[in-house]
């Protein structure tokens, strides 16, 4: 078995929604990114790649490559799952923590879990997503952006 950790951050920019866990969430800002800015799926992708010893999403989907401009992070995550499986691994479980002062995440977490489980080809109880604030401290507390920590357990296929 292997464990991987992923971390990602995106800065807020002009916009009226963010995408997290494949869910479009109305917000007073958007997220600045080369792809769709889904910081949750980016952190999960990094955790999976790290556990399999396959580098990170920047290696597989460089932000200098125009083919990934505006890319759907669910498509990228499914690709990551495919290369992890090709190396002889399957997902045991994943756990992620969204760090954001706003928007409120609780109304969206179950849908995020469902979409992630679908993309990872696992049962819903193998996916956990939670959210916390930093009590208005730091860049997330000042509502400058969102961060996500994620861990993944891989098992031999």
Curated annotation (Swiss-Prot):
Site (Transition state stabilizer): 34, 133
Similarity annotation: Belongs to the IspF family.
Binding positions for 4-CDP-2-C-methyl-D-erythritol 2-phosphate per the UniProt entry: 8-10, 34-35, 56-58, 61-65, 132-135, 139, 142
Co-factor binding details: Binds 1 divalent metal cation per subunit.
PANTHER family in alphabetical order: 2-C-METHYL-D-ERYTHRITOL 2,4-CYCLODIPHOSPHATE SYNTHASE, CHLOROPLASTIC (PTHR43181:SF1)
UniProt-listed NCBIfam families: ispF (TIGR00151)
Subunit field text: Homotrimer.
Cofactor(s) for this UniProt protein: a divalent metal cation
Residues spanning the signal sequence: none
Transmembrane segments: none
Name this polypeptide is given: 2-C-methyl-D-erythritol 2,4-cyclodiphosphate synthase
EC class: lyase
Entry keyword set: Isoprene biosynthesis, Lyase, Metal-binding
EC number(s) from the headed UniProt entry: 4.6.1.12
Catalytic activity: 4-CDP-2-C-methyl-D-erythritol 2-phosphate = 2-C-methyl-D-erythritol 2,4-cyclic diphosphate + CMP
Pathway the protein contributes to: Isoprenoid biosynthesis; isopentenyl diphosphate biosynthesis via DXP pathway; isopentenyl diphosphate from 1-deoxy-D-xylulose 5-phosphate: step 4/6
GO process terms (BP): isopentenyl diphosphate biosynthetic process, methylerythritol 4-phosphate pathway; terpenoid biosynthetic process
InterPro entries: MECDP_synthase, MECDP_synthase_CS, MECDP_synthase_sf
Gene Ontology MF terms in the entry: 2-C-methyl-D-erythritol 2,4-cyclodiphosphate synthase activity; metal ion binding
Pfam families, sorted: YgbB
Protein residues bound to a divalent metal cation: 8, 10, 42
Keyword Lyase among record annotations: yes
Protein task: Involved in the biosynthesis of isopentenyl diphosphate (IPP) and dimethylallyl diphosphate (DMAPP), two major building blocks of isoprenoid compounds. Catalyzes the conversion of 4-diphosphocytidyl-2-C-methyl-D-erythritol 2-phosphate (CDP-ME2P) to 2-C-methyl-D-erythritol 2,4-cyclodiphosphate (ME-CPP) with a corresponding release of cytidine 5-monophosphate (CMP).
């Amino acid at each position: 078995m292997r464990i991987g950790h992923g971390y990602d951050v995106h800065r807020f920019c002009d916009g009226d929604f963010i995408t997290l866990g494949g869910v479009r969430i109305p917000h007073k800002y958007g997220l600045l990114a080369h792809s769709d800015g889904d910081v949750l799926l980016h952190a999960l992708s990094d955790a999976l790649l790290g556990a399999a010893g396959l580098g990170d999403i920047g290696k597989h989907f460089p932000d200098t490559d125009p083919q990934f401009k505006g890319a759907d992070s669910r498509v990228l995550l499914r690709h990551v799952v495919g290369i992890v499986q090709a190396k002889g691994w399957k997902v045991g479980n994943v756990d992620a923590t969204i760090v954001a002062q706003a928007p409120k995440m609780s109304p969206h977490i179950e849908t995020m879990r469902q979409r992630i489980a679908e993309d990872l080809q696992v049962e819903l109880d193998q996916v956990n997503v939670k959210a916390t604030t930093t009590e208005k401290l730091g860049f997330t507390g000042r509502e400058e952006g969102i961060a996500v920590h994620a861990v993944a357990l891989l098992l031999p296929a």
